[in-house]
Amino acid sequence: MSELSYRRILLKLSGEALMGDGDYGIDPKVINRLAHEVIEAQQAGAQVALVIGGGNIFRGAGLAASGMDRVTGDHMGMLATVINALAMQDALEKLGAKVRVMSAIKINDVCEDFIRRRAIRHLEKGRIAIFAAGTGNPFFTTDSGAALRAIEIGADLLLKATKVDGVYDKDPKKHTDAVRYDSLTYDRVILQGLEVMDTAAFALARDSDLPLRIFGMSEPGVLLRILHGEQIGTLVQGRS
């Protein structure tokens, strides 16, 4: 195959991606399949970092709407991302990978604190880095956390795996005539309100000239194909 188009990537997975067909928690078969995909990408020569959401366990914003204090709910959501990060670490290590979980909040008995230089060093040494607890601040989603960490580690590409195979002009599950975009600018995504990531994450990536590819990860080998330059999903970059 061709040479890699990207040498350092950050892959954002939703917590829901770990559920499989279930309504809650982690499906071992699903997390093992995702772990295989990540290791395949690393073995091809890429430095790989991960951010995983926590929606399969807890959503702070949802309970805040029901009356829970938003800050408390967001802190609980951060802990959910740590649970998912540890689960992914276990799955990757069982396949022989060297992995470090780094948290934005202090939880030193189970993972490291996020320190930028240390995170980059882990990647340079061939370890997979999993960044947990978002930005460490309430009111910010794990999408924003993923964009921030990707910028901090100098990633060549931010990847967001979704349930659909890119960005559409309308919901493809509800509209059979929905059209998928091959590429978009950040300004157009924000202006049109295309809700595939939150606006803060889009703006952060735009202002740092970080390209973003949104794609579906249901097909085996898709991550490796993207690393080799295949135009899969929707590429978001630049300004209008």
UniProtKB/Swiss-Prot annotation:
Keywords: ATP-binding, Cytoplasm, Kinase, Nucleotide-binding, Pyrimidine biosynthesis, Transferase
Record flagged with keyword Glycoprotein: no
Single biological process term from Gene Ontology: UDP biosynthetic process
UniProt xrefs under Gene3D superfamilies: Acetylglutamate kinase-like (3.40.1160.10)
Residues bound to ATP: K12, L13, S14, G15, G55, R59, T162, Y168, D171
Domain of life: Bacteria
Enzyme class: transferase
Keyword Protein transport part of the UniProt annotation: no
Coiled-coil stretches: none
E.C. numbers: 2.7.4.22
InterPro entries: AceGlu_kinase-like_sf, Asp/Glu/Uridylate_kinase, Uridylate_kinase, Uridylate_kinase_bac
Pathway(s) annotated for this protein in UniProt: Pyrimidine metabolism; CTP biosynthesis via de novo pathway; UDP from UMP (UMPK route): step 1/1
Residues annotated to bind UMP: G54, D74, T135, G136, N137, P138, F139, F140, T141, T142
Pfam families noted in UniProt: AA_kinase (PF00696)
Localization, UniProt: Cytoplasm
Control of this protein's activity: Inhibited by UTP.
One term of GO molecular function: UMP kinase activity
One CC-aspect GO term: cytosol
Catalytic activity: UMP + ATP = UDP + ADP
Function statement: Catalyzes the reversible phosphorylation of UMP to UDP.
Subunit field text: Homohexamer.
Family: Belongs to the UMP kinase family.
Protein name: Uridylate kinase
Organism for this UniProt entry: Xanthomonas axonopodis pv. citri (strain 306)
Gene from which this protein is expressed: pyrH
